[in-house]
Amino acid sequence: MADRVRARIVVSGRVQGVAFRQSAADEGRRLGVKGWVRNLPDGRVEAEVEGERAAVGALVRWCHAGPPAARVDGVEVEWVDPAGDLGAFEIRF
C-alpha cells in the first residue's frame, strides 16, 4: 500500500476570479488525489486533499504557482492524519 498523506492548504494572493478552484480540481483529478477546494470569504482559497505522498506533494507544489492568471503570495500547508473520508476531487461553494 502506498504511503498516504493528507494536507490542508490555504493559498493567498490573487487567487479568486482567476479559475484557481477549477484548475486545482483539474490538477487534483489528474494526480489522482481525493479532496475539495473552495473560496474563503477573505479572498484566499482553501483545499483539503488526501492521497499518495508524491501526488499530494505535487499538488502542493502546483499551488505555489496556480493557473496563469493567478498571483500566489503565500501557501500554508498543515499536514494531518489521513482519514480516508474524502471523495472524488470537487469544488465546494
Swiss-Prot record:
What keyword terms does UniProt attach to this protein? Hydrolase
The residues annotated as the active site are 21, 39
According to the UniProt entry, what is the EC number of this protein? 3.6.1.7
Query: In the record, what lineage is assigned to the organism producing the protein?
Result: Bacteria, Pseudomonadati, Myxococcota, Myxococcia, Myxococcales
Cited Pfam families: Acylphosphatase
Q: Which GO terms describe its molecular function?
A: acylphosphatase activity
Q: Family per UniProt?
A: Belongs to the acylphosphatase family.
Q: What is this protein called?
A: Acylphosphatase
Q: What positions does the domain Acylphosphatase-like occupy?
A: 6-93
Xref: NCBIfam families: PRK14441.1, PRK14444.1
Reaction it catalyzes: an acyl phosphate + H2O = a carboxylate + phosphate + H(+)
User: Which Gene3D superfamilies does this one have?
Assistant: 3.30.70.100
